[in-house]
Amino acid sequence: MLIHAQGVDSESFFKVMPKLAKKYHVYAVDCYGHGGSLHDASKYNVVDIGNAVIDFIQNEIEKPVSLLGHSSGGLIAAYVASHSNLCRNLILEDPPFFSSQGERRKSTFNFVDLSTVCHEFLTQTETSDFVLYYFSHQYAWNFFPEKSREKIREKMIGMAAKFRQKNPDENLRVPFWPKAALAGFQGMNRYDPRFGEAFYTDSFHAGILHEELLRNIHCRTMFMKAKADVSSDGILLGALGEGDLHQVLEALPDCRLIRFDCGHGIHVEKSKEFIRQVEIFR
């Protein structure tokens, strides 16, 4: 069973699903606030989503599963594993343990990027197109050379706006924009920015400490760790740092750690190695 990251939907796994389906019966769900699932801001927390996943496994699959969660989906998967006996194998794909909770969250890429953009979008009235708003205001513009940044930004936003006008129901495509970055727009058409607001306010975690979640996991576990760095102004450019990873492994002493030389979307950027590791862990 696959649980996607925030901002995208279950289709974000389409690149790896055909090969996984050769050895698994694959289930991929849309979390609340994403895709075709319920859009109700009161449900945008790890408890309500986690319990919905537990209910789905109990009533639809009717037996324990191998559960894989990417990013925030990994936090949800950890909740399921720690609050039920329905998880046989747990695979955590670069989830933001410790870094996304409490005051720490304010110094992470997700906070200065998606969370803050969601918050600002919800407080303005000029546009209702969140996809274009996010593209226009994303933190990634800071990575462009300062001298040419605004010129490039203006041109790219113009191309994105034309695409959105002609193809409002399609996933965003912008010429020259990296494919790995565009993968983050998969399903954003049906993303509720109030979900990002839950990470902005820290309400997503419903008061449950990450260490508490991890220490109550007793099934086989594998952690997939992507690259991370820290910017000159102290922003964690990645899901979690080495200190956070150390805390994860302390709480899960029998966890298998696999490192990937890529960005946050491991199943997108390193799909072959991702599939290989999942099959080895079976």
Label each region the model flagged:
Residues 91-150:
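Flexible "cap/lid" loop of the alpha/beta hydrolase fold
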Residues 31-68, 72, 79, 103-109, ...:
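Active-site loop/oxyanion-hole signature of alpha/beta-hydrolase fold enzymes
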Residues 150-212, 228:
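Hydrophobic, aromatic-rich cap/lid helix
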Residues 74-85, 90:
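Short glycine-enriched nucleophile-adjacent loop
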Residues 259-271:
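Catalytic histidine-centered segment of alpha/beta-hydrolase-like enzymes
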Residues 215-261:
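Conserved loop-alpha-helix segment in the C-terminal half of the alpha/beta-hydrolase fold
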Residues 1-39:
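Conserved HGGG/HGGXW glycine-rich cap/lid loop of the alpha/beta-hydrolase fold
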Residues 268-280:
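Post-His helix in hydrolase/transferase enzymes
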